[in-house]
Amino acid sequence: SSDLKDTQLALTNSGGIRNEIPAGAVTMGAVISTFPFPNELVTMDLTGKQLRSLMEHGAGLSNGVLQVSKGLEMKYDSSKPIGQRVTVLTLNGKPIDDATVYHIATNSFLADGGDGFAAFTEGQARNTSGGYYVSNAIVDYFKAGNTITDEQLKGMRVADVKK
């Protein structure tokens, strides 16, 4: 849908990814074992302030940092007080602006505030894909002839910079 094409970034929970898809031909079994939950794709608008709130919440959890799409970068310092840990939050190299509205994609578990990520429930212009699951999106990505290279996977987009 055009709604997905206009998405600026995507966020998912670490616990929603349960395996790695091995190199080579991608099988349906590999996709299902990696993304086993029936989470639908959801798009919504969030302000930069709401995005920062989500990232702060993740930085306060022992294993709950959100996994982010290409172009989004977050650095946080786990030695700082909760709520003040995010030190860098950029999209395509530009700082996330509190007042700017960003069109994001996530899964239905997070969209409903799962894992305590409450700011997702404040999202505007919400659109649930109605039976179109995260696993469907992964399959469609590969069916369209897209690949994932080692180069694309290099570098941490989310990193703890604690000294």
What is the meaning of each model-derived region?
Residues 3-163:
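Feature captures C-terminal
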